[in-house]
């Protein structure tokens, strides 16, 4: 059994070590082949490791970092001044080969610029894209990107994102010929901005894609497409709206279930709550920063230990599929990026 090593930014996210340490414990208990490098301030981490009986765990190793990056910090300032931050040290562990992937719930902008500096982009790729897998109505997954890295995009960038999403769907979700769609304000071919229209022409003319046209926002989880491509501004708003609605319904049904228990009523609400749990954002936490010379997983900033543990497991899946190597091979082998 080969050992897989993930570096975890212990100081990242809204809750920091109080959730990252127990998340590491959960992930280690689920995967016997997993090693975790826990990166952060040892003065804060050592007491928590003792509290969770992890001080002498053979598969967890503490890597000290004296600084951390706040959620409000400007990315360029963090890049310049936080060279010993838990985020930066985590990325350097991947760059040096000590870790095969890394996970952070920290500042997204800082993570992107640091990752581009430390790991660099794969050949021929312009920018990284943030990619997530959403559960859909067919019981499968729909890959969506970009989810916030790139607010201003060109058609060539969206074409590259389609390539990344296509590879992700094939190798992570085992979809042989992923159906690719562009997120738009309507399904009709005449609808959409100049960016969307020009990107549609690129995708439709490229025979390597199974391009199916436009999808609207209410079709994100319909299962009509395996990959949905959009700019980071649109994608971030669409995803967070969907997650907010999912959390609302889940919390309402959970409250109804608790009320039923008090009143000794039937278990209908509990059954619905169980069915909907797969739609809860915590269940699919962990967005991939694709296009880099290394595996970088961005967790929700407000993720709890269960959600963070899922992000770590997501990193392991990408290690096993050797995703950066597959992406690099695709872009080196095909020169269609030169448009």
Curated annotation (Swiss-Prot):
- CC per GO annotation: cytoplasm
Main location as per UniProt: cytoplasm
Which InterPro entries does this UniProt record tie to the protein?
A: FA_synthesis, Phospholipid_synth_PlsX-like
Which GO biological process annotations does it have? fatty acid biosynthetic process; phospholipid biosynthetic process
* Listed pathway(s): Lipid metabolism; phospholipid metabolism
Family, similarity comment: Belongs to the PlsX family.
Q: Which NCBIfam families match?
A: plsX
Q: What does this protein do?
A: Catalyzes the reversible formation of acyl-phosphate (acyl-PO(4)) from acyl-[acyl-carrier-protein] (acyl-ACP). This enzyme utilizes acyl-ACP as fatty acyl donor, but not acyl-CoA.
State what protein this is by name. Answer: Phosphate acyltransferase
Q: Which organism is it from?
A: Tolumonas auensis (strain DSM 9187 / NBRC 110442 / TA 4)
